[in-house]
């Protein structure tokens, strides 16, 4: 299975033992933050199971949603990405594969996306801070992911940044949008860039 392959070939090699899918199968619920009271699909408190309905229908294991982790293990994964697949002196993921996945795929269509990763807007450097994605400071080489439930990771090899922000935007319900309205995730990221630029 894909999940077993990723666990053995990536997560274990970087020492990430608290990252994976369906954590309710491995850990007591006291160690897992509840996600949301789902009043639409499952009609219950989601606790240790994937939030995304499509991934839930796939048994909680998918390539687009459902990965649970501690901040520490997620940072290890981001460091693997920042180092272009190298970790602890071993090339775990091909540098060429990561380069391809983190490159803009369709710039001619003004599409900023990589394969599985967000990228800054193509004209980010021309925009005001409030119009940028994710922030004005992000280099064209940077990449990351902004999750629906409130997670945010951003890697910027140009400035040696690996940024992990874990929160729960959808608790108690998905209608809680304060995190997005206040731009907390990207404001903190810009503060990281500002501290680097001020040196």
Say what each PLM segment does.
Residues 1-140:
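Short, surface-exposed loop or secondary-structure junction motifs
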Residues 73, 145-199:
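Structured C-terminal helix/loop/strand segments within mature extracytoplasmic catalytic/sensor domains
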């Amino acid at each position: 299975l894909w999940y077993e392959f990723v666990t053995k070939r990536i997560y274990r090699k970087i020492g990430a033992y608290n990252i994976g899918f369906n954590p309710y199968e491995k850990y007591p619920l006291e160690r897992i933050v509840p996600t949301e009271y789902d009043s639409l699909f499952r009609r219950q408190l989601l606790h240790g199971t994937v939030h995304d309905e499509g991934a839930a229908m796939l048994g909680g294991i998918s390539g687009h949603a459902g990965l649970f982790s501690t901040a520490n293990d997620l940072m290890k994964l981001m460091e693997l990405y920042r180092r272009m697949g190298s970790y602890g002196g071993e090339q775990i993921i091909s540098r060429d594969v990561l380069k391809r996945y983190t490159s803009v795929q369709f710039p001619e269509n003004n599409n900023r996306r990589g394969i599985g990763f967000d990228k800054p807007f193509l004209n980010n450097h021309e925009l005001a801070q409030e119009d940028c994605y994710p922030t004005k400071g992000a280099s064209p080489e940077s990449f990351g992911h902004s999750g629906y439930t409130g997670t945010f990771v951003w890697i910027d090899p140009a400035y040696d940044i690996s940024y992990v922000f874990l929160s729960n935007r959808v608790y108690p319900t998905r209608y809680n949008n304060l995190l997005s309205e206040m731009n907390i995730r990207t404001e903190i990221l810009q503060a990281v860039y500002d501290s680097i630029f001020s040196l």
